[in-house]
Amino acid sequence: MALRMLLLLLLLWCSNPGSAENSSLPGPPYNHTNGRLPDRDTGSAVLRLFYVITGLCGLISLYFLIRAFRLKKSQRRRYGLLTNTEEHEEMASQDSEEETVFETRNLR
């Protein structure tokens, strides 16, 4: 019995006084508001924002690089006058049955 009493007194002596919200003992006044944000949270948010922006810029540049190399346009064939006078093309007229021969030697 004395051992139980000693243990009970030891526990009461080591216990913390109750908080102001849940105790019959008055505690010191406590201010729940804090005027500034903790530095650790602000720094990690800025660092996370930096990583997100860097990742987005990397993805956008990768998209444009892939688009530039995959959709490389082949050289367009330029149509103009024939340089060789031996090459003649005959085209049939749809309106009449006459044949028209196009020559390039006098067109320059």
Swiss-Prot record:
The chain crosses the membrane at residues 47-69. It comes from the Eukaryota. Glycans are attached at residue 22. Residues 1-20 form the signal peptide. Keywords: Glycoprotein, Membrane, Phosphoprotein, Signal, Transmembrane, Transmembrane helix. Pfam families: DUF1180. InterPro entries: FAM174-like. GO terms for cellular component: cytoplasm; extracellular region; membrane. The modification Phosphoserine is found at residues 93, 96. Belongs to the FAM174 family. This is Protein FAM174C. It comes from Mus musculus (Mouse). The gene is Fam174c.
